[in-house]
Amino acid sequence: MNQDQLKQLVGQKAVEYIQDGMQVGLGTGSTVKFMVDALGERVKNEHLNIVGVSTSDRTAAQAKALGIPMKSVDEVDHLDLTIDGADEIADDFQGVKGGGAALLFEKIVAINSDKVMWIVDESKMVHQLGAFGLPVEVIPYGSQHVFEKMAARGYNPVFRKVNDELVRTDSNNIIIDLHIDPITDPHALAEDLIHMVGVVEHGLFLDMVNTVIVGHANGPEVIEARP
């Protein structure tokens, strides 16, 4: 199985957990795209009555095109389940997210969810976080000073660019990717980053995920990370 087939596998498995009447957070990224496709099929074929809440403009556009009823996060009192991808998941089920530059909205939706599920192919399961760059969302104003503070701490920051243009988030902020390998104390790092003036949010998703579905060639593995 290639990587896309593994992603499709876990996406299809994840939608089995969505029940009639649920308010569901829809993540962002290549794996989630397969999940949203599968959810659209269930809505169409089973007349599944659910409401989706998106973590990005591109997921919202995909869901609407598939006929999935959508609301904004501020229009729902809670979310029953959020299904999202992850860039890295460590042995203790701490995660790094934000490769798709949607980490702020993803975290807002996740913390307002009763349950959080991450769907990944097996390459995303690691012993310790850090090989994947850690995304940090910062406001543009003063971002060079934030960058220099990060560099002084030894975080090896890099402004994220595509075609020599700064990547912009859906909130029009920018992303600084940190290269800290390994991340030995993610909780301490998270505290340090969130207290830097100009930092909006970081891509450490700690003590948050309940269920992880991992795509293997022999089928999806469902792991209960925490109650």
From Swiss-Prot:
**Which processes are annotated in GO (biological process)?**
pentose-phosphate shunt, non-oxidative branch
Q: Which UniProt keywords apply?
A: Isomerase
Q: Which Pfam families match?
A: Rib_5-P_isom_A
Task: Kindly list the positions annotated as binding substrate.
Answer: T28, G29, S30, T31, D84, G85, A86, D87, K97, G98, G99, G100, K124
Enzyme kind, highest EC tier: isomerase
Q: Where is the active site?
A: E106
Its UniProt entry gives the catalysed reaction(s) as: aldehydo-D-ribose 5-phosphate = D-ribulose 5-phosphate
Q: Which HAMAP family match?
A: Rib_5P_isom_A
Q: Which family does it belong to?
A: Belongs to the ribose 5-phosphate isomerase family.
This molecule's function is given as: Catalyzes the reversible conversion of ribose-5-phosphate to ribulose 5-phosphate.
Quaternary structure note: Homodimer.
This protein's name: Ribose-5-phosphate isomerase A
Q: Which gene encodes it?
A: rpiA
